[in-house]
Amino acid sequence: LLYVSDRRGNRIQVFRQNGEYLMERFVRPETGGSGSGFSLQFSRDPEQSLLYLIDGTNQRVWVLRRKDLAILDRFGRPGRQSGEFIRAHMIAIDSKNRMYTGEAGNGRRIQRWVLKGTRPTSSVKPPAEQ
């Protein structure tokens, strides 16, 4: 399956490889301007059961169940402290289940998170700052 993060459309869409549309989930549809669906990443469990969507307008990470795109959780808020975002823009999860979020513009930082279930248990400084 192909999962598409439609930034300005405030949604995730799912298609078969032949282009057949399967489903979509709107995430904060009232968000204007830059939209809410910046980048997405699959969880690292064998089933890849979760999707993590970075929302660079509302400064959040949304957690969705992959099979039906149900929203399970969200975390983050605007700000400059650990666990907060300024222009959140990218998301990645490594093989050790650590999540990385990157910020553009004035944010200019990467935060590293330790995931347990759907939420991070902690955020730590980027390797360059440790």
Q: Regions from the language model: what does each represent?
A:
Residues 1-130:
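Eukaryotic scaffold repeat domains enriched in small/polar residues
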